[in-house]
Every structure is written in structure tokens, then in C-alpha cells.
């Protein structure tokens, strides 16, 4: 019995080491890190990896599960905030901070590389929350009325570009960009826009 318990404990520790190593490497280098590098970093063999995670997709799911859950929780908190504008700001700050600190998460949410299926499931869960977040801020008169849920991906696309270009020299520079962007989203600053938002079909074609 003790031998069985020891084996189970060893297996659990090995799984934790694999997930921890993958989390660190995905966050630093993105989801294209080879699994051989992950096992080497964990000090384990490929056989151990495949016993726990037969595919890289399964390993990525385990690594990013908590990150996805935190984004959904941030959206839920924003929707529940009494001040809808403050809730929207907090959500954007938390979401972009997650992008800035976790390149793997940013890759997956941008539909780059592995993990696209899990990312789409997360997006399907969070979309109704984002719509409600935007609706509440507009109902309170703090978010410009012509901002649509379909405009929100543009916020992340452009912010991710800032993150990519400045990460090595000023890791938090995206916060300055977000400040400029938020000023443009305030209802009192609104001026007519020259073009309508992308449709859902157009957004899907950009992925």
C-alpha cells in the first residue's frame, strides 16, 4: 500500500512539475515552445510527459485553465460593479496585464498556434459578459453610445501590438496607451466615427 501511495505521489509531483515548467516557458516564449524543452526544464523524460499529457493541446489546456478562469471572473466582477465605467476599466486593466505577463495566453487568445479550441470556448463564455459590461456603461452615460462589442477586439489587437513592441524596454507602457484609449471611449469625448464596427463575420475572417 505504501509503495502504491508513493507512486501516486510521484506521479502527482511529476504532473505538477510539467505544468509549472510549461506555464513558465509558455508565459515567457509563447505556445510554440517545443515539448522537449518543457520536459528538459522540468527534469523529466518524454515518456513521463506523454503519460500525463498525450498531446500538447492537453498540456496547454492544463496550463491556461486558471488564466482563462481569472479572465472570466474579472468580467463577472466588472458586470457586477455599481459603477459600470469603473468596472470596465478594471476589466481592461486586468485583461491586458494578463496579456502582458503571459505571452502564451496572448497567443492563444489571438488564435495563434495551439489552444485555439479552448480559447474559442472561453470567448463564447465571456462574450455575453462583455456585452452586458458595455451595455451597462452606456446606460449609465459614461461609455460613448456608438461603441459596440465588436469594437472590443480592436482594443486588444492594438494593445497587444504595443505590448509586443515595448515589452523589452518598458513592460508597463501599455498602461499609457490604455489611458489614451479610455479617454477616447468616454461619452463626453465622443465625436462621430467615420466607419461602422466590423461585423461578426468580418471579425471571424480576421482570425
Regions found by a protein language model. Name each.
Residues 1-5, 128-139, 165-207:
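C-terminal peripheral helix-coil segments that are non-catalytic and often amphipathic
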Residues 115-160, 164-168, 172, 176:
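Amphipathic alpha-helical packing segments from all-alpha helical-bundle domains
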Residues 1-41, 58-61:
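Basic, helix-initiating cap at the start of DNA-binding domains
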Residues 107-116, 196-199:
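Short linear capping/connector segments at secondary-structure termini
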Residues 43-53:
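Short hydrophobic/aromatic patch on the recognition helix
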Residues 20, 69, 85-100, 175-183:
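Amphipathic alpha-helical segments that line or abut small-molecule/effector binding pockets
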Residues 62, 73-101, 114-118, 123-125, ...:
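Hydrophobic alpha-helical connector segments
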